[in-house]
Amino acid sequence: IAGTHTNMKDCCLLAGCCTRRDIRFVAKRELLKPPFGFLFRMSGIIPVDRKIHDATVMPAVNKILSEGGMVGIFPEGTINRTDDIIMPFKKGAVRMSLENNCKILPFAINGKYKRGKLKIKFGDAYFPETNDIEKETKLLEQKVIKLIKECE
């Protein structure tokens, strides 16, 4: 699954109420530090060092997906604290899909976790149509923007 990142609670929300399958999220390595590191470790996050090209992420993702697991990623790479509808997407979600021949399930979370204001919208799962990672990443961005607008 791939979509917007509006708050630290996104992973819990998606994992807890949107599927019966476990979702292993790609998340910044810093989350493994105290005080909550043990919780993130227990949740099985796939840690990524965002300061470097972390070569350990794709093998971990490939293993999970090859075993029928589900991986969650926030293609913006961080929580969007800007006024922009989304930040430019990184290519990881499309790479994961292409390398593992698996569908991408786009989603949008709209709202800032104020009482009664949160909405989640899922799109249709799809396979990228081409091997053009740049083009397919832009297409994923467009799908997520459409979902955000449908949440308004």
Where are these predicted regions, by residue range?
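Catalytic core of membrane glycerolipid acyltransferases/transacylases, capturing the structured
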Residues: 2-52
